[in-house]
From Swiss-Prot:
GO terms for cellular component: chloroplast; cytosolic small ribosomal subunit. One of its GO terms (biological process) is translation. This is Small ribosomal subunit protein uS3c. It comes from Picea abies. It is found in: Plastid, Chloroplast.
Length: 218
């Protein structure tokens, strides 16, 4: 039986880097780790809540967090940064996000710095493609059509290969199954292959569907 492993952890230190950069004493490690997860969740929820229209989606590729003694630095890599600009009020949207994160952390003695980095080719990032697929599935667009369209979007961004897998009660069928599609080559067993990956669950009227995307960036 095949032994499954996370493609990002499999390549950590070779083609993938850590998303959090900090050191902590043993007694504080679990607390800081939970804080990182809360920060990422808060940012994702904020972007979903403050998008301009129902046809848009967050477009967050990844969130990197680094810590110093009294400073938390957060860098958000996003495909569509204008979604954070609320009603033309400039960067007040980012300031509101900063205040929301600080209130969630319930800390007054630490500083928080948030930077936005635009992703040049957003559809080369599996997280952004997964959000797009999830939005289409929520609208009951056929899953095969959605996968074909997602592969086309990725190939326009000149990726070497992409593989998409969707599992669950597809098209409302009573028996859950797994369907997948691929464009180009995706060498999952090659450690030096620069493969990006994400898993994204989506709630539909038929239940939860799991979306997995592998993208070869070379």
């Amino acid at each position: 039986m095949a032994q499954k492993i996370n493609p990002l952890g499999f390549r950590l230190g070779v083609t993938q880097n850590d998303r959090s950069h900090w050191f902590a004493q043993q007694r504080n490690y679990s607390k800081d780790l939970r804080e990182d997860q809360k920060i990422r969740t808060c940012i994702e929820n904020y972007v979903r809540t403050h998008i301009k229209s129902s046809s848009n989606y967050g477009g967050i590729a990844r969130v990197e967090i680094s810590r110093k003694i009294d400073l938390i630095q957060v860098k958000i890599y996003i495909g569509f940064p204008n979604l954070l600009l609320i009603e033309g009020r400039g960067f007040q949207g980012i300031e509101k996000l900063k205040n929301d994160v600080l209130n969630m952390l319930d800390s007054v003695d630490r500083k928080l710095h948030i930077a936005i980095e635009k992703v040049a080719k957003p559809y080369r990032k599996p997280n952004i493609l997964a959000e797009y697929i999830a939005l289409q599935l929520e609208k009951r667009v056929p899953f095969r059509k959605t996968m074909k369209k997602a592969i086309e979007l990725a190939e326009r961004e000149e990726v070497e290969g992409i593989q998409i897998q969707i599992a669950g009660r597809l098209d409302g069928k009573e028996i859950a199954r797994v369907e997948w599609d691929r464009g180009g080559r995706v060498p999952l067993q090659t450690i030096r292959a620069r493969i990006d990956y994400c898993y994204y669950p989506v709630q539909t009227i038929y239940g939860v569907l799991g979306i997995k995307i592998w993208i070869l960036e070379e």
